[in-house]
Amino acid sequence: MLKTLAILGAGRVGRALARLLHERGWRILVVAARSDATARKAAKYIRAGQPIAGISHHALAARTILVSVPDDAIPEIAAELARIGGQQLRGKIVLHTSGACEASVLQAVRAFGAFAASMHPLQTFNGVSVPPLEGKIFAIEGDAPAVRVARSIARSLGGIPVNIAAEKKPLYHAAGAFAAGLVLALEEAGVQMLKASGLSHREALHALLSLSRQVLEHYEKLGPHKAWTGPLSRGDYGVVAANEEAIARSHPEFLEAYQAVSRLSGHVLAADPAAVLGHLENLPRHSPLLSKSKGGSA
């Protein structure tokens, strides 16, 4: 298989994948971005590739074209690539790295005989350091020839390629959002509440990161039900009500999230979800708006 790549898009994911692939023997021929400056910066980061502004025929020199742009821009990029490449796309492999979109968003290049697939590494990219991808899941779906190349790329990076049904991509992506971005929001809300309790930012962050790591270790070793702790797991609904009242007074904007996550805990962690949810429904309700209007004295 010809290990030549054109990178369309200079975002965090595309840059990181290209650099890692370059280090593992793939030839990065082209790095395309919206502007010359961005393309040059990306090529410098990758340490390979001819920087190009916009989509051009130069990308057609590669056997595989990797589209790594915001989800909404993928069809536009595919259409432009189809316009420029036409019949020269026949037999090419075109991949995109979106977690939510299916390979079908690349239909414009499929129409000219290219093979398309989506390949999403389940990993966060901060744009500063290059994340290690060994042992990370790569969710892949699409045309068989493109899937084979995507699986080869994943294995080159030490990743674990897994097949996913196209129609399940949004659910797969939502699962990642649950475990990453939403957990981060809960962590930061907890830090803010600890700071309001009198801890410094450093103390609050250290306390909750230590707690969260321990919970995740227990989750991995013991499973969800045995790892579950806190007043709700013990059926201590008086403490849950006191928590809600404290949040309503101090951070009313967090109250609905606390209540929603409590219900979610009942659904997915409790041995008897109906009983837990019933108790939660019978707790005294605290209105975030009322608490805010009374200046936190509700």
What are these regions (language model features)?
Residues 1-57:
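NAD(P)+-binding Rossmann beta1-loop-alpha1 motif at the extreme N-terminus of oxidoreductases
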Residues 2-4, 91, 135:
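Phosphate-coordination loops involved in phosphoryl transfer and adenosine-cofactor binding
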Residues 5-7, 67, 140:
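Hydrophobic Val/Ile/Leu positions in short beta-strands of Rossmann-like dinucleotide-binding domains
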Residues 29-33, 94-97, 138-141:
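Short, hydrophobic beta-strand segments that form beta-sheet elements in well-ordered domains
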Residues 36, 45-46, 50-130:
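Rossmann-like NAD(P)(H) cofactor-binding subdomain of soluble oxidoreductases
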Residues 42-45, 109, 113, 130-221:
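Internal alpha-helical scaffold of NAD(P)-dependent oxidoreductase catalytic cores
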Residues 217-275:
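Interdomain hinge/lid region at the active-site interface
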Residues 251, 265-269, 274-298:
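NAD(P)-dependent dehydrogenase/reductase Rossmann-like domain
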